[in-house]
Amino acid sequence: MDRLTVDTSELHKPLIKFEFSSLIQFEGEDEETYEPEVEVDLLFKLERVCNGVKECLRSWRYLKEFDVEDPEERDNLELEIEISEPFTVIFCDKNICPGCCEYRMVVEGKDFEGEFEFLRVVKPVLTALIQGYVSCDY
């Protein structure tokens, strides 16, 4: 989705606040059943790569489920859903390796129900605010 490189080699006790924001959009439908369902299940992961070692720092789940049903199980129903909503997460990293590390947000589709006209994550932005102490050698 998005990535950035952070260099903390000149900082003592660095702390990094990450914010990831995006827009999740989908249009799905299910029809000709007495229990139509539309479901989107995504897993967002913040990964850190330092010295070639990849580590998942944190994951967040995005889950939307919509269903209707005919309790008599006689009528075929139709369900159409269109969603466009923000998805934002914040994470603070304080266990930082000295030097340069790459941070990236990735998304993985876990489960889907229904038929989709489209499903996308748009405008992904990963930002970082870094603080720490700088040693003065002069």
Which residues are covered by each model-predicted region?
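Extracellular jelly-roll beta-sandwich "head" domains, especially the C-terminal globular C1q domain
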Residues: 1-138
